[in-house]
Amino acid sequence: MVESQKAMPQPKMGRIRRIHFVGIGGVGMCGIAEVLLNLGYEVSGSDLKASPVTERLESFGAEIFVGHRAENAATADVLVVSSAINPANPEVATALERRIPVVPRAEMLAELMRYRHGVAVAGTHGKTTTTSLLASVFAAGGLDPTFVIGGRLTAAGTNAQLGTSRYLIAEADESDASFLHLQPMVAVVTNIDADHMATYEGDFNKLKKTFVEFLHNLPFYGLAVMCLDDPVVREILPQVKRPTVTYGFSEEADIRAINVRQQGMQTHFTVLRRDCEPLEVSVNMPGNHNVLNALATIAIATDEGITDEAIIQGLSGFQGVGRRFQVYGELPVEGGSVMLVDDYGHHPTEVAAVIKAVRGGWPSRRLVIVYQPHRYSRTRDLYDDFVQVLGDANVLLLMEVYPAGEEPIPGADSRQLCHSIRQRGKLDPIYIERGAELAPLVKPLLRAGDILICQGAGDVGGLAPQLMKSPLFAGAKQEKSK
């Protein structure tokens, strides 16, 4: 199946010519900016510092400003902002004063989706991986989709790409409820967990109702793809008044996995689909959570008529996403080496899934985790869960909380987490005040065969490459690109 529609209707946003992104280096912003650049719009943007992301956009023709100043927005026809941008930002204030429209990033994404067959992936966990798998399988099926992803797709070298077909595949962000702007043709709900609860006034029922409202943005002929294994998704399923397909390990699911075998980084399983032949597939990712992500992908690909051969190829050829159990390489230690992994997981459910994946794929190896909590509010709200989950590592080093703009909350810091985990009696965590201290602290703790994971959503993401370059680990072997 090959679909190419060069005459695809494109967003003609009236009098809009120049689009300015406030915080253009953000993972949710840069992808939309790149697609708009490729559509021929003038794009400018500002961020607090230059980065490889802003340099990439600049190479495509974007005008990049370092720092936020009123004059940056002076010639814009519209400003795009994320929820992280303060309304007092001078560029936003100038735009409002001059009556220049200021729109959330999700509204701009919705404008792109309006002209395409939109596939929106929602859920507390697994959005980025599922969206990336969909992009890979659709490409293998000859559908050349446009995609906007919250992580760098290894095969494409970017988190966004303008395709030639009618399909647009994107993440749907529930963190600020902005996914309600989207009106896709197909929507996935991977799971629903307690996170970003300030958006929902601490009311979990409100969070559930918002997911149902999101699914009702589908047309009556659309499709809701829902994970039956998640108890909350199962709970809201009867409320969804749209066509649905379910997936999971449950025997009740429309599309389910059996005979799961994990061998290191590879996971093999059999897919059972109603009215279809069983399908033998493999993915280059460990863990049952990634089997579920693959099942969501298979459900949509099957519904869209993508061949089984293309599904198998797209899944087996998937090269992963940046910071989603990304293997950096091998660090030399006495008697052998240590596998170094970088991971974005920052919720107890995500940490638990990674630990389970390691235990399943490498049962005889010790797990050393360097973890950085993300946001004081999340640490406070999920404190007991963090204590329980992090205590399942063999060795644990805790960095101070990455604030993400929040003020400290008493009792919700990493020193207190260390104390609480230590009281459980299973292990004695080590507190790290600064990331620069990691190499000399962690090296004496490592043994040949260990798996070392740097995990979290903050600046812990820079530590794996630093360890690879550290003189203390001279001779480190970089993971070869697949």
Curated annotation (Swiss-Prot):
Any one of the GO BP annotations: cell wall organization
Keyword set includes Phosphoprotein: no
InterPro entries in the record: Mur-like_cat_sf (IPR036565), Mur_ligase_C (IPR004101), Mur_ligase_C_dom_sf (IPR036615), Mur_ligase_cen (IPR013221), Mur_ligase_N (IPR000713), MurCDEF_pg_biosynth (IPR050061), UDP-N-AcMur_Ala_ligase_MurC (IPR005758)
UniProt keyword annotation of Oxidoreductase present: no
Enzyme Commission number(s) of this protein: 6.3.2.8
Localisation: Cytoplasm
GO cellular component, one term: cytoplasm
Molecular function terms, GO-annotated: ATP binding; UDP-N-acetylmuramate-L-alanine ligase activity
Keywords from the UniProt entry: ATP-binding, Cell cycle, Cell division, Cell shape, Cell wall biogenesis/degradation, Cytoplasm, Ligase, Nucleotide-binding, Peptidoglycan synthesis
Pathway listed: Cell wall biogenesis; peptidoglycan biosynthesis
Function summary: Cell wall formation.
Family: Belongs to the MurCDEF family.
Name assigned to this protein: UDP-N-acetylmuramate--L-alanine ligase
Species whose genome carries this gene: Pseudomonas putida (strain GB-1)
Lineage: Bacteria, Pseudomonadati, Pseudomonadota, Gammaproteobacteria, Pseudomonadales
Gene giving rise to this polypeptide: murC
